[in-house]
A protein has these predicted regions:
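Rossmann-like NAD(P)H-binding beta-loop-alpha module
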Residues: 152-175
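A conserved FAD-binding loop/helix module that cradles the flavin
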Residues: 168, 293-340
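N-terminal Rossmann-like FAD-binding beta1-loop-alpha1 element of flavoenzymes
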Residues: 4-31, 168-173
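FAD-binding core/adjacent interface of flavoenzyme oxidoreductases
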Residues: 1-9, 29, 37, 79-154, ...
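Glycine-rich FAD pyrophosphate-binding loop
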Residues: 23-44, 180-190
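Conserved N-terminal glycine-rich FAD pyrophosphate-binding loop of Rossmann-like flavoproteins
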Residues: 36-60, 191-195
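A Rossmann-like FAD-binding core segment of flavoenzymes
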Residues: 73-101, 106-109, 173-277, 326-332
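FAD-site-proximal beta/loop scaffold in flavoenzymes
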Residues: 129-150, 247, 251-304, 312, ...
Length: 340
């Protein structure tokens, strides 16, 4: 039985930073994550993607941010149960919780922080004939950009109208031989600055932007079994426009799934856990939810916001674990950081 003060479910940036904040209060943490390594989406889906809205970092690669967070929390010696999924929870008479994973690993904790990002995440896929054929063995359909160098000097078609599609269009412009972005509408859902950059790049013929259109067919090379072109249908026209490509990236976002946590008796709204913004507690005393997995009025799914939520959550968890202790806020600039 693994015993800890706070059991954190999810080893993404929010969960990792919660370890640091807990360590400042001398609270021990243990983290469960279904992935084989810490970092969540940052490490698994886009480690080479630059992030621009972390305070103090004009730009930082997602993978480097994870590395820095791991270095920051090392002094607090967190435990990890990786490659396993939290399945069942039991609340004991003393107020502690027993969480058991799909592999049977048991954890006892005085507080639970669910920081699972989107839970188990799967890409939203277009409905296309032969899609599964081109998904396997590097045949041309990709849903994530883990290593941009894979697309060096290649012809890339991106479909989507959100931040992910826009960001990778901008980034791959200087990597790929050709970049085409296709959106079924004229209005984009992404950040206005990114939208303007893509518009400007199209005007300068650095990329090709095709709107009011969607990919409806895939074509491959008979000898290599690799994707060679996508067929595009445009509103108001009957003929397909074929664009030759080496890779097709349908970036329509992720489908969030809470998995077994959905059966833990928590108030849930559209696959997100409802919380009180005072301390990011759920309707079950002792269980908190922080990061992208929670929801509340005005919620912003930003790493920065997750850090804030983790900080307030830990303060509340301390009061729950040590109800008779006074917690005086200490500044690290004055007191430094004392590890375990």
């Amino acid at each position: 039985m693994i015993q800890t003060d706070i059991l954190i479910i999810g080893a993404g940036p929010t969960g990792l930073f919660a370890v640091f904040e807990a360590g400042l209060l001398q609270l021990k943490c243990h983290i469960i994550d279904a992935l084989p390594q810490p970092g969540g989406q940052l490490a698994e889906l886009y480690p080479k993607k630059p992030i621009f809205d972390i305070p103090g970092y004009p730009s930082v690669l997602a993978g480097d941010l994870v590395t820095n967070l791991m270095e920051q929390i090392k002094q607090f010696q967190p435990g990890f149960t990786l490659g396993e999924t939290a399945e069942t929870i039991e609340k004991l008479e003393d107020g502690t919780f027993i969480v058991t994973t799909n592999e049977g690993t048991k954890h006892q904790a005085k507080a639970i922080a669910i920081a699972g990002g989107l839970g188990t995440f799967e890409p939203r896929k277009p409905i296309l004939k032969d899609l599964e054929f081109y998904e396997i063995e590097d045949r041309g359909v990709e849903y994530f950009v883990k290593d941009p160098e894979k697309f060096r000097n290649k012809r890339v078609v991106i479909a989507g109208g959100g931040d992910s599609a826009l960001d990778w269009t901008i980034f791959l412009k200087d990597v790929a031989a050709e970049v085409t972005i296709i959106h079924r509408r004229t209005q984009f859902r992404g950040h206005p600055d990114s939208v303007q950059k893509v518009m400007d790049m199209d005007a300068q013929k650095d990329i090709q932007l095709i709107v009011n259109s969607e990919v409806v067919q895939l074509k491959g090379d008979a000898e290599s079994n690799h994707l060679s072109a996508v067929g595009i249908a445009t509103d108001g026209t009957e003929e397909l426009n074929w664009v030759e490509c080496d890779y097709f990236l349908p970036l329509f976002g992720l489908s969030p799934k809470l998995g077994p946590i959905a059966d833990w008796g928590l108030n849930i709204d559209k696959a997100a856990i409802e919380v009180n913004t005072f301390d990011y507690s759920t309707n079950v005393p002792g269980i908190y939810a922080i990061g992208d997995i929670n929801t509340y009025p005005g919620k912003l799914k930003l790493i920065l916001c997750g850090f804030h939520e983790a900080t307030l959550m830990v303060q509340s968890a301390f009061k729950r674990i040590y109800p008779n202790k006074n917690n005086v806020l200490k500044y690290t600039t004055v007191n430094g950081v004392q590890g375990f």
